[in-house]
Amino acid sequence: MRKTYWLMALFAVLVLGGCQMASRSDPTPTLAEAFWPKEAPVYGLDDPEAIPGRYIVVFKKGKGQSLLQGGITTLQARLAPQGVVVTQAYTGALQGFAAEMAPQALEAFRQSPDVEFIEADKVVRAWATQSPAPWGLDRIDQRDLPLSNSYTYTATGRGVNVYVIDTGIRTTHREFGGRARVGYDALGGNGQDCNGHGTHVAGTIGGVTYGVAKAVNLYAVRVLDCNGSGSTSGVIAGVDWVTRNHRRPAVANMSLGGGVSTALDNAVKNSIAAGVVYAVAAGNDNANACNYSPARVAEALTVGATTSSDARASFSNYGSCVDLFAPGASIPSAWYTSDTATQTLNGTSMATPHVAGVAALYLEQNPSATPASVASAILNGATTGRLSGIGSGSPNRLLYSLLSSGSGSTAPCTSCSYYTGSLSGPGDYNFQPNGTYYYSPAGTHRAWLRGPAGTDFDLYLWRWDGSRWLTVGSSTGPTSEESLSYSGTAGYYLWRIYAYSGSGMYEFWLQRP
């Protein structure tokens, strides 16, 4: 009886809660508490890449521990009587789990006061395409064309640990010289690469011939299968493992992505807050990167791809969520078919490991640098104004590898509105901008929140549906800084800033469509 009590209680909440919903026919928004969100939102149900019947359940901070104690085996035993099949359990980057469940169980979790949100599990793919030398390294160590036919470096990344969240790595390949090993396999295999994508990415990061940082330690975190595809829940499992098991200084490379996923975004944010630098691919759809995850995570370094003529590659995503560009067309590197095999590929997948490699170079010389400091150094050191056809909203920044040892800081955004406020302690909240909502056309909303050191302030975005507010986005990491990107339809929007712990003044930046 004990093992079924928790979910039975959820169903009781569902039955009783159905009698308490406020109703309002006036389409004009109100800030009255009766019309605030009452149930956990479910994201991604209409996504064409959604996997039917599979969901990711994320608990609120401080909740769900009793259910997660004992790991996936215990969790499965407790939820199996309700027809819930648990596939992943998360205790590092997120507090939650992934499972197959029927609509009745989904609705029960949605009504639980302990659940932050639920998300449809989705297909995730590697961001690369095959194509029939090595110019990428040559380009990043110089400011201008023409290429010098050489790669100059003052560091090798020795002592830095890079986690390749991908299809695995052929760890025996000669490019790696014994520095590659298996960390984790979310698919239950041995971490070896049966696709090639992960080995190619690892070669660009740390191969002796093709690598930016030629002495790094490489760890395979396999989340994609032999076809180069996987699920959001599996990718989160890889991020969760990195968060719990990384050794500093640490960098993670994610040359993969898919549609918008709040769960994946929050997992990456929390992993960065735990001290891991993340380089993520912008995507290969020639579209706005703000519509992809984890590309839209502001704390990560989101990378677009360029050609050898310093033009944005025709396939590369673009926009304000891109932080910088790096070589990503016709990039040769190691391949999985033998210990000496090579292959030439195109993609933002190929651009991203150049950035991960430069992060490793910087961390060798600055091993205690925070992810924010590493990102600032890379962005401040980038070559500017050289690229063509970068796409609307994109920064004209090209990766540069010969960084100075100092770090700097960058503003979170340009051409955005700035607000301040104060929270008195846990449970206090403010609405922004300036205590009210705003009407917006369709497009991307982006916001950044900075609270005092040692606090934990969280960020929520609500949208008015004509009768009540719905939560459409949230950023609830464990630190004083949050960021959120959401692409939505025209309508009324409202930002809620909430103090989970601590008090004091905060800064808030808002970029509207």
Swiss-Prot record:
GO terms for biological process: proteolysis. The active site is at D166, H197, S349. It catalyses: Exhibits low specificity toward esters of amino acids with small hydrophobic or aromatic residues at the P1 position. Optimum temperature is 80 degrees Celsius for caseinolytic activity. It is found in: Secreted. Residues 15-127, 409-513 form a propeptide. Its EC number is 3.4.21.111. This is Aqualysin-1. It comes from Thermus aquaticus.
